[in-house]
Amino acid sequence: MNANPKFLAATAEVDAAAVAPLPKSRKVYETGSRPDIRVPFREIEQADTPTMFGGEKNPPLTVYDTSGPYTDPQASIDIRRGLPALRRAWIEERGDTEVLDGPTSDYGKERLTDPKLTAMRFDLQRPPRRARAGANVTQMHYARRGIVTPEMEFIALRENLRREHYLETLRASGPDGEKLAKRLLRQHPGQSFGAALPSAITPEFVREEVARGRAIIPANINHPEIEPMIIGRNFLVKINANIGNSAVSSGIGEEVEKMTWAIRWGGDTVMDLSTGKHIHETREWIIRNSPVPIGTVPIYQALEKVDGKAEELTWEIFRDTLIEQAEQGVDYFTIHAGVRLPFIPMTADRMTGIVSRGGSIMAKWCLAHHKESFLYERFEEICEIMKAYDVSFSLGDGLRPGSGYDANDEAQFAELKTLGELTQVAWKHDVQVMIEGPGHVPMQMIKENMELQLKHCDEAPFYTLGPLTTDIAPGYDHITSGIGAALIGWYGTAMLCYVTPKEHLGLPNKKDVKDGIITYKIAAHAADLAKGHPGAAIRDNALSKARFEFRWDDQFNLGLDPDTAKEFHDETLPKDSMKVAHFCSMCGPHFCSMKITQDVRDYAAAQGVSEKDALQQGMQEKAVEFVKKGAEVYHRT
């Protein structure tokens, strides 16, 4: 169905599961140079090390937090009002925007005055903004003029993850604090493939990366609710979660719920890919309640306006859709301007043809009119709209391969070169750009994608869907793609678009969203570790220490999904007493490798020898015992 008939604005409620704090976690904030720069983090409490393992303190660990106010018990959440306008003062004080009387798009006006929509409409009292005549309000424009915005300072604090605070608490944790700090901050050298990864992120570094075009800050002036974040290969690898209704499934309430669920588990951005009848209203509810950037594919809604007939699309309809969505607050648009008429014949010999919805829409339009795409021909006009609201481009890969068979072919790379050319056009207008990538690519062919993207697109951030490394696993494509995502993230991709188990099969539900998010958080973190991102190993080291010390609850809570970890453990060892046991059900009490290792260490300490000598001594003792018992391999019992 197109909209849930039970959804009424007056009775809309937040998903209770999305607002509960994660186990042993609390929301903490770091304040910047001004009191309204308050950067949120999640702090995970840890138990002390048991006395038999040394009895030391384990300070709380800070992790990146995308959940916004939802997991803060001090926050009052009412999705009917939306989130606080965190950035309003920052936008207003720049003095380069004007408040409009109301929506200026034809469609926006039509929806606002339709009485049939009153019961489901979000009651936004705030009119939209637009750049003043002749002004440019993009973060890139400010960056290129040497301005460090509050958004940039916010991001610098956020990316550093309070590492200095953690170091100080480790050092102050006890007499061996310095030793503990050195141990827990240890990290293997990475291979960054040319990425520049400073030991600490400064606001000036953020400004430089945005000015250069190597990073983007998706932050529409009409989405003041967002907590600023950055996408770029010299920063933490980010992930995107796709949500959205269709003509046959889901409604407004479900999509808002999916959004809050996605950000709870780590979605850095969310794309609303709704294709049903109430796209406009669904998007408004999502944006007003989202602390993360929201992306869309405007051609989907434009197609709905012509009853799904691609050949009837016009520039005027598309332009009105861009303005409509920009005034709602969409932070980035996927626009398939690289699907050009000359490239379409290149897909003729493909196994799976054109699999991108946006790409196929534009290919059909080009063939129906035998004309160049209006997205390509009107690209500079699109840039004028983007810079009036600070909407970032996500230049779509409409010719991405839909199977390993089609990977790295002529059509894919012809489009990539065009996206590089369009990037230069957008940058001329100081419009922020990231480039979308494949798709389905076998592992040995992934690196070429990254290398060519850096070459053709002048290091603009790469944003990839996977890629899926094999085509044989419907129902498990979060895994087939997670493999490729980890690799391409290591090579330099800045943001990974998640794939859920339902990929190619159906619309994902809440469980699928979580499965996709966790899979891609693993891929992104693995990429950060492989690149050698400063501090990336801290959480791994803390969890490994907890595991060796049999601090079961800390193991669960330091992980990406505490609920599932605890559930799996409790299936066989459910009692509270088992949370302090020195074994799990995998090996049992007598064969736990970590317990055996600890026994060796205890023996070494008692004998006053090294662990190596203790092992050798133990082997000699067993050899003597073997000979005394007759040197028989087997004994009858």
Swiss-Prot record:
Instruction: Identify which cofactors the protein needs according to its UniProt entry.
Output: [4Fe-4S] cluster
What GO annotations for molecular function exist for this entry? 4 iron, 4 sulfur cluster binding; carbon-carbon lyase activity; zinc ion binding
**Residues involved in Zn(2+) binding:** H440, H504
Does the record's keyword annotation contain 4Fe-4S? yes
| Residue numbers binding [4Fe-4S] cluster | C584, C587, C592
| Annotated binding of substrate, by residue | N242, M271, Y300, H336, S356, R357, G358, D397, G398, L399, R400, E436, Y463
What enzyme category does the UniProt record give? lyase
Which controlled-vocabulary keywords does the entry list?
A: 4Fe-4S, Iron, Iron-sulfur, Lyase, Metal-binding, S-adenosyl-L-methionine, Thiamine biosynthesis, Zinc
Top-level taxon: Bacteria
Q: Report the sequence similarity comment from the record.
A: Belongs to the ThiC family.
Q: Indicate the quaternary assembly.
A: Homodimer.
What name is this protein filed under?
Phosphomethylpyrimidine synthase
Task: Please name the source species.
Answer: Bordetella parapertussis (strain 12822 / ATCC BAA-587 / NCTC 13253)
Q: What is the lineage of its organism?
A: Bacteria, Pseudomonadati, Pseudomonadota, Betaproteobacteria, Burkholderiales
